[in-house]
Amino acid sequence: MAQPPVVAKPESSPSSAGNQLFACKSIDKLISDAEDPGHRLKKTLGPWSLTALGIGAIIGSGIFVLTGTAAAGEFFQAPSILHAQVLDLIVNFLKGGGTASVLMHGRPPAGPSIAISFFLVAIACSFAGLCYAELASMIPIAGSAYTYSYATLGEIFAWIIGWDLILEYVVSNVVVAIGFGAYIKAQLASFGLDLPDRWSTPVWESGHWTGSYFNFPAFLIVFILTVLLVRGVKESAEANNVMVAIKIGAILIFLIVGGMLVNPTNWKPFAPSGFSGIVTGGAIVFFTYIGFDSVSTAAEEARNPQRDLPIGIIGSLIICTLLYVGVSIVLLGMMKYTTFVSGDAAQAPVAYALEHLGANRFARSVIVIGALMGMISSLLVFQYGQARIWYAMSRDCLFPRLFSAVHKKFKTPHISTWIAGFAVGIPAGIFAISDAADLSNIGTLFAFVLVSLGVILLRRKQPDRPRAFRVPLVPWFPLVSIVLCGGLMTGLTVITWIRFVVWLVLGLLIYVFYSRKHSEFCKTRG
């Protein structure tokens, strides 16, 4: 096991606990800590591997599912005020209305214009993406938004966003792992191989025991990926490159096969609900773009981070946008958007369209494989990023030093990787938490807000510091990012906000009773 980190003197020595909360760590100190031989990670990633990490994180199975839902629109009733959207409650309160109307949710159909929705959402995400690109090239450290906040906003904000990122990565991957388990179980059943429910379904669901012993497929996929990540980042990146290539190949095959089945009359009317349908469609598909920020967690393993991190972040966004727009144009040309309102057509629109229009079994099988690769690569990248967040927080002494241990042979943060694996694998084997999936979304948006704010602050505090990539039109572009992400946060439900606040309060208690006392700044002050 690697030796414990040497605690070096931070940029400043806060004279009080209050000053410590807002003390920023210098960028030079952050970089020098990363070069400590006892904690140095192996630099093996180039621009394609970084771009593939972004694509692997962004494109899951959603491209094969949400396109139809957003095109067809949806209408449902929330079971209680806790499941109402915060924005709806605010608007309704200002109008002086009752709560009944707030519980009724409706999104008009975007129809074929969902292609425009994908394009507009990509532009919205690019504002945050540009901010990540500037800070990632300027502060090439594994902690992503956590590290950027430590350098710009202070220790307490760094802790909050680090704790928030843990929530984002854990919840997201638990949900994906459970989805993978259910998907692989269904696919095996189609070949006559039935996995016993007691070993392939959640133990606890909707507040009661199910009679299952353990969701073994969900746990197994996380365990296998954890072993791969411990073995080395080069091996993990190569595996991700292969899965991304298969995933992109599956999408391209769909575009070719589906393109031959397009009936142009299905594109009329192009925008059945006008601009409102385009906007609400964008709200549904926005979260299919989340994941590009995970590229920044690979900063310390990139061969040329100043050049390649912006390429990975922006390149993955561009490639995914082209694929999303292409799939939406072809899918909505194959069948009328009203087809995808309910049933199998709503659950798996791409597979449904191929099957009902007589596509051969090979094309349908490719889509199944593409969806599986999408889930596995997403799991891999987020598990990778999660371990790097914990590693960075441990190196700053906000987490126990054990988390920043680096394997002597593989040069990976193996302890953090194993802990991250079990933190996801065990809950995935026991619980069904799909209703908590929005916790990942609110955590991501919160990180986007702080990173965008960090760009503005660093431009003011260190305007002459070299930047390999610069966000244009500062502060306007970062401000647009803050407004858009903040607005999307209000579109989430009340229960999501409550859970998010409870998680942050729990994190603050840990900070007060442990992290604050072990921080480098505290030791310097002492």
Question: Would you name each region that the model predicts?
Answer:
Residues 64-67, 127, 141, 164-182, ...:
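Membrane-helix boundary/coupling elements in multi-pass transport proteins
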Residues 2-111, 130, 141-142, 464, ...:
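Membrane-interface "cap" regions at the ends of multi-pass membrane proteins
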Residues 63-206, 316-319, 326, 503-508:
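Extracellular loop-to-transmembrane helix junctions
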Residues 43-54, 113-116, 154-167, 217-221, ...:
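Select transmembrane alpha-helical segments in multipass membrane proteins
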Residues 186, 251-254, 390, 440-467, ...:
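Hydrophobic alpha-helical segments of multi-pass membrane transport proteins
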Residues 26, 32, 36-42, 82, ...:
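Helix-loop-helix junctions that connect adjacent transmembrane segments
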Residues 77-109, 147-148, 154, 186-197, ...:
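TM-loop-TM module centered on a large, flexible mid-protein loop between adjacent transmembrane helices
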Residues 210-214, 272, 402-414, 448-497, ...:
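C-terminal membrane-solvent junction of multi-pass transporters and transport-like membrane proteins
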